[in-house]
Amino acid sequence: MTVNNPLNEIFSNGSAVRILRQLAETMTPVTGRECARRSNLSHRTALENLNGLESTGIVNRIFGGRDHLFSLNRENLFVKDVLIPIFEQEKKLKRTLYRLIVDHYKDIATSILVFGSVARGEDTPESDLDICIIVPDESTKRKIEKRTVSVLLEVKQKFGVTLSNILLTEKEFRNGVDNQIELYQNIVNESKLLFGTSIKEIMHGKALTGKESK
């Protein structure tokens, strides 16, 4: 690993970053094949990058058996003081983003859900953050609409993320699901609850405001 500007070496390769992120989340050594699976890379690409990371001293290789095992070298100061804190902050950043959105709407929303490419883990730099906000009635929907522009601007300014909201009353949501409209089906199948009442409870008419998702 270079002494001057080591981040240039590490973060110039997206595949290496994926591997390091996965290794940072486990204390147990993994095979190259398992690392490839977790990082959503081909086995060959994963091994090439693991070899390179081993040469920098960031990754340890354990020899033995048919498959070599790999782990993050947690005694390495660059790993301890730079990489692990960066990945921890990366996860915290998403939680902070979701918290900001929830805090703006939780006083009157029935449910707040994230769906689309972000919920599927398939987002790209060009992707919007799709949020579905379900409210009790039309009057509440109008209150939400008045807040939307300022929230969109704040999210863009602080996180560089383009927010795309869909606002629905509980009745609109139930009707859309019952009529098997594709957008509503996608929300049912892939969404993650950020705040409030679950989709199942809404469909059964048991919506309650003020309940935060864990």
Feature-to-residue mapping (PLM):
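Conserved catalytic motifs of the protein kinase core domain
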Residues: 128
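Catalytic core of pol beta-like nucleotidyltransferases
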Residues: 2-110, 119-125, 136-214
